[in-house]
Amino acid sequence: MLKEILLGNAEKGIITQIYGPPGVGKTNICIINSINAVNSGKVIYIDTEGGLSIERIKQIASNNYKIVLENMIIYNAFDFYEQDKIIQKELPLITNNASLIVVDNITSLYRLELSDEANKNIMLNKMLGNQVKTLLKLAKTNNLAVIITNQVRETVNGFEASGGRLLEYWSKCIVRLEKLNGDRLAILEKHLHAGEERVKFRIVERGIEIID
């Protein structure tokens, strides 16, 4: 199950959450899944951090990069309210022929809006929850895959995903990424039909290489 996600076959009909510190490979996994998904439909990619590199898509897709880019709809969201508009208003209109939706990163703009104002934070939490519910509805209605990436926050024992129980509840598959002596470790923390799995991998020019 975990290897399938890393190599571009995220499960349809559910939300897969991938979280970890910066530079651990979240966007690479999203790109690999996008390249694979264009074989069965459009890919809708919402980039909230400017991390999606066309050059990286060309590297991984190689000779097929033009076909990949022609079948990707890329949104750049610059604030949390724009992200909300894209997910709530625009996605439902264009997902009929889609095979994958990516939101990379779903919490970065949300965290920028958080403040000391309790009422504002309650509103932001509600907006985030409604976004994720909409994504799940689209996944189920259109039988497509949804991948959301997430930031981390430090805890006493290391780090945990941002967004708390809200994102944990709606994500039926959760993958944690860690750096491991120059390589990477992926941990399947949650899945409806699978127990915990661990896979070592490294990021290479053509994508990801699984380490046996």
UniProtKB/Swiss-Prot annotation:
The keyword ATP-binding applies. It comes from the Archaea. One of its GO terms (biological process) is DNA repair. ATP binds at G20, P21, P22, G23, V24, G25, K26, T27. NCBIfam families: recomb_radB. PANTHER family: DNA REPAIR AND RECOMBINATION PROTEIN RADB, RECA/RAD51/RADA DNA STRAND-PAIRING FAMILY MEMBER. This is DNA repair and recombination protein RadB.
